[in-house]
């Protein structure tokens, strides 16, 4: 066929990759939302959702149908364009970051030489969804949530990036495949344990998950920045949160736990098992930890996490210089 040129084939492959990433990541996030509700019920000694389907297995479908048929109402006092744009950014920002995560040595959306920088850019973009939602809603609780999000992001984005610089220094590259290959003999979690801890903390904060969910604290801000959202717009915020958890969990596996590497089992299975473990850790953190005060969250970021990150970076630089001599 004359129209099937190499350029057209490249476009078709890119579209197929994008659709696969979309359906797989959103499907994992949807499964996690159901698993979270069941596990929280187990942790809190209650049943959890168990009415729709066998063992509550169709509860997610029922929730999606309910959300789909709810009125897509936009308050008259909002900025309609920004109000509509905010949930789209929340859904797509960390979903795009998943494109740079290699599932195996050949399965990935995009093999970028600046892959890690692309993730940091998308993580910084995600906060604009919260800012747009809080500002455009013209609601004092939404605006307070947006202000909290901007200040919290300013604090935690600093050591989110610095916690990864030790990994980059050891691998000598921002490319995700190169970082995984550099862990063939020793996973980065051992020499970069402080970087691993601070990246996990910053990852929870980037996803606005408990205990760093101050921008949407129900007891203080009545659900915060998405108080005026309903229907599918609220659904995009909801799904975007779980997409962020999947992306951060996959990045933890790639950067610190050898990615797809492991004995006996196929690489895809190893990657899926490791990622699922850290997704479950997000749920356990929500069940086990209380929500601290907002000033305590900010102090913890600047006074504890940032010094630990700088200490890890200095130690990594010293080791690299010593071994190079």
Swiss-Prot record:
Its EC number is 7.1.1.-. It catalyses: a quinone + NADH + 5 H(+)(in) = a quinol + NAD(+) + 4 H(+)(out). It comes from the Bacteria. It holds the Pfam family NADHdh. Its main location: membrane. It is an enzyme of class 7 (translocase). One of its GO terms (biological process) is aerobic respiration. One of its GO terms (cellular component) is plasma membrane. PANTHER family: NADH DEHYDROGENASE SUBUNIT 1, NADH-UBIQUINONE OXIDOREDUCTASE CHAIN 1. NDH-1 is composed of 13 different subunits. Subunits NuoA, H, J, K, L, M, N constitute the membrane sector of the complex. This is NADH-quinone oxidoreductase subunit H. The lineage of its organism: Bacteria, Pseudomonadati, Pseudomonadota, Gammaproteobacteria, Enterobacterales. The gene is nuoH.
């Amino acid at each position: 066929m004359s129209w099937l040129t190499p350029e057209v084939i490249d476009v078709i492959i890119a579209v197929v990759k994008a659709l696969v990433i979309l359906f797989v990541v959103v499907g994992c996030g949807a499964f996690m939302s159901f698993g979270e509700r069941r596990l929280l019920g187990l942790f809190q000694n209650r049943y959890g959702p168990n009415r729709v389907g066998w063992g509550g297995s169709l509860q997610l479908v029922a929730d999606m149908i309910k959300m789909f048929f709810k009125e897509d109402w936009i308050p008259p006092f909002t900025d309609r364009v920004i109000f509509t744009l905010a949930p789209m950014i929340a859904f797509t920002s960390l979903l795009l970051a998943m494109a740079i995560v290699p599932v195996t040595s050949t399965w990935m959306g995009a093999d970028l030489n600046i892959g890690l920088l692309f993730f940091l850019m998308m993580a910084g973009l995600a906060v604009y969804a919260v800012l747009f939602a809080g500002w455009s809603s013209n609601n004092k609780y939404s605006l307070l949530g947006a202000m909290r999000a901007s200040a919290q992001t300013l604090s935690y984005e600093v050591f989110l990036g610095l916690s990864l610089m030790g990994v980059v220094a050891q691998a000598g590259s921002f490319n995700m495949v190169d970082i995984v290959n550099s862990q063939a003999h020793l996973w980065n979690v051992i020499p970069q344990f402080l970087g691993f801890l601070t990246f996990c903390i910053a990852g929870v904060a980037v996803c606005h998950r408990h205990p760093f969910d101050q921008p949407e604290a129900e007891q203080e801000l009545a659900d915060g920045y998405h108080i005026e959202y309903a229907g599918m717009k609220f659904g995009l915020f909801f799904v975007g949160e779980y997409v962020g958890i999947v992306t951060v969990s996959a990045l933890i596996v790639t950067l610190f736990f050898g990615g797809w590497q492991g004995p006996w089992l196929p690489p895809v299975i190893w990657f899926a098992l490791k990622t699922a473990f850290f997704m479950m850790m997000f749920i356990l953190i929500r069940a086990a930890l209380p929500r601290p005060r907002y000033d305590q969250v900010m102090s913890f970021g600047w006074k504890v996490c940032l010094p630990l990150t700088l200490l890890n970076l200095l130690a990594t630089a010293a080791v690299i210089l010593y071994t190079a001599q």
